[in-house]
Regions:
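Short, charged/polar low-complexity linear motifs in solvent-exposed/disordered segments
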Residues: 5-7, 37-39, 79
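The N-cap/first-turn positions of alpha helices
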Residues: 15-19
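Recognition helix of helix-turn-helix DNA-binding domains
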Residues: 26-61
Length: 80
């Protein structure tokens, strides 16, 4: 629910939302690139877009922002 809320609030693309979910799950950008079969350059571009859209500057800030959203999102499932 938190990722779905972030996706709607910040107009994230499906790829950006998937990256966000992976980061929340503890994956690194390289892990995500390997799992998706894409280049790290692609993931870095998606990360840059995520940071820009959420007005955060670092991956840690992004994860903290979504963690705060988890406090207000419905508690049924954070894996949307």
């Amino acid at each position: 629910a938190a990722v779905a809320l972030a996706r709607q609030a910040y107009r994230l693309s499906p790829a950006e939302a998937a990256l966000l979910l992976a980061l929340l799950g503890g994956q690194t950008p390289q892990d995500f690139a390997d799992a998706r079969g894409v280049r790290i350059r692609t993931v870095r571009a998606q990360m840059s877009a995520l940071l820009f859209k959420t007005r955060t500057q670092r991956q840690q800030d992004l994860v903290a922002l979504v963690a705060r959203l988890m406090l207000v999102a419905p508690q049924n499932d954070f894996r949307d």
